[in-house]
Amino acid sequence: MKNAAELWHNVLSVIEEEQRTPKASYDMWLKSTEGVTLNGTTLIVSAPAAFTVTWLERQYLSLLEDTVEEVTGSRLDIQFIEEGQAKHMLDRQNEEVEVMEVAPAKTKAQKTPKSSDELVMSELGQLNEKYTFDTFVIGSGNRFAHAASLAVAEAPAKAYNPLFIYGGVGLGKTHLMHAIGQYVQDQKLGTKIAYVSSEQFTNDFINSIRDNKTVQFRNKYRNIDVLLIDDIQFLAGKEQTQEEFFHTFNALHNDQKQIIISSDRPPKEIPTLEDRLRSRFEWGLITDITPPDLETRIAILRKKANAEQLDVSNEVMLYIASQIDTNIRELEGALTRVIAYANLVGRTIDPNVAAEALHNIMPASEPRKVTIRDIQESVSKHFNLPFDDLKAKKRTKSIAFPRQIAMYLSREMTESSLPKIGEEFGGRDHTTVIHAHEKISTLVKSDGETGKVIEQIKHELKHS
C-alpha cells in the first residue's frame, strides 16, 4: 500500500512539474487522488466522488497510464474507485494482515491451488457489476432486445440459442451481455460464464498456436456453460479464427450451452464472414438496438444522476438529452461534463451552465463522419435498389453502375483502405475498387448527368 501511494505521488509529481495538464485541471481532478494498492498489474487509485471517477476514466486514463509506465518502466492498468470503496478495501486488507500475523505460517503444501474452473474464469474476463438488468433503461429502441436477453438469462440454452444482438456503438449491447451473465451467475451458482471480445478470442487462439497449446485453448473455451462474445464483426477476414470459432460454437451448441453474440451489424452484413458461421448465427434470435428516443435519453440521465446522488433538474436533463441524440456513452459523458464544469466554476447546475459546459469543455462537434454503410444506403435509395444488391455478385448494368458509384464515393468520402472498401462490397478485390473509381472519375468529367448524381448523393450524405 505504501508502494502504491509513493508510486502515485511520483506520477502526479511528473505531471505537475512538466505541466502535462493545465494547473486548474490538475488541481480540480488529479490533486485529490491517492494510490491505494497495487494488485498484480493493476494500480488502484481513489478519487473523491463517482463523477470524478468517471471523468478521470474518460479524460485522463491514457495520460496517467503512459506516465505510470514512464515512472515504473512497466505498463500497469489503472482502476479508479471512490474514497469510500478505498477505505473499505484498506480496512479489509488490514484485517487480513492481522489474521496472518497470528496464524501459523502455511507451507507450500498447505496452499490450496485454484481449481481449473477458477483458472478458466479468471482468464476469460470479468463481468462488470454495474451492468445489470436493474440499471438498464428500457425504451422503444431496445425493448425487444432487453426482453430477449432476460428470457435467455432466465432459461439459458432453452429460449434463444444463440442470441445475436446488433446495433451501433454505445447503445447498450455490452450492458445487456453483462446483465445476462450477472443474472445467470446470481441465479445458478456454479455456472461457468465467459465474457470475451472477439479480439481476445483471436489473440488467445494465435497464442495457443504459437505456444503449441491448442488443446488447452479448446478446453478453456468449450468447457463453459455460457459464452458471451462481443464485437463478433472483428472476426471478418480471419479465416483460421473463424474456423476455430465455428468448431467452438458447434461444441457448445451441441452440449446445450448458451451463446450470446454482439455485433455492430446483422450477420448477413458482416463482410467476409463464412456462410456456415452466418447460418449458425441465424439459428437462434437476432435482435437489434436502435438509438434512444428523447424520453429514453432523459430516463437514462435521470437514472445516472440518481445512482450518483446528484441533484440535476429536469430542465438540465432535457437540454442535455436534446443535444446528444445517438450514443448513450456520449449522453452520460455529457452529464459528467456538466457536473464537472459546475463544480469547477462553483455554480449551480442550470440550463445555462449546461450550455456553457457542453460548449466550452466538449470539443466543438466535428461534422459526422460518413461511413461506407451510409454511402451504400444513400446509393440504394437513390437508384431504388435493394441494399443487398450492392454487395451481391450480380453484374447487370442496373446494379453494377450504382455499385461503382458507391465504391467511388467510398474512396472519396471515407478514409477506408481499398481492401476495406472491397470487403464492404461483398468481399471484392481492391483492384475492382480501383477500376470503379477510375471509371466514375472519367464519367464525372465527361458526363454531366453522372456528375449531377454524384453531387446530389454527396449533398444528401453531408446533410442527413
UniProtKB/Swiss-Prot annotation:
GO CC, one annotated term: cytoplasm
UniProt keyword list: ATP-binding, Cytoplasm, DNA replication, DNA-binding, Lipid-binding, Nucleotide-binding
Residue segments, region Domain I, interacts with DnaA modulators: 1-82
Subcellular location: Cytoplasm
GO molecular function, one term: lipid binding
CDD domains from the UniProt entry: AAA, Bac_DnaA_C
GO BP terms in the entry: DNA replication initiation; regulation of DNA replication
Major localisation: cytoplasm
Binding-site residues for ATP, renumbered to this chain: 170, 172-174
Region (Domain IV, binds dsDNA) residue spans: 343-464
Stretch list, region Domain II: 82-125
Residue ranges, annotated region (Domain III, AAA+ region): 126-342
Assembly description: Oligomerizes as a right-handed, spiral filament on DNA at oriC.
HAMAP family linked: DnaA_bact
Record function comment: Plays an essential role in the initiation and regulation of chromosomal replication. ATP-DnaA binds to the origin of replication (oriC) to initiate formation of the DNA replication initiation complex once per cell cycle. Binds the DnaA box (a 9 base pair repeat at the origin) and separates the double-stranded (ds)DNA. Forms a right-handed helical filament on oriC DNA; dsDNA binds to the exterior of the filament while single-stranded (ss)DNA is stabiized in the filament's interior.
Domain notes: Domain I is involved in oligomerization and binding regulators, domain II is flexibile and of varying length in different bacteria, domain III forms the AAA+ region, while domain IV binds dsDNA.
PANTHER family (UniProt xref): CHROMOSOMAL REPLICATION INITIATOR PROTEIN DNAA
Similarity remark: Belongs to the DnaA family.
Name assigned to this protein: Chromosomal replication initiator protein DnaA
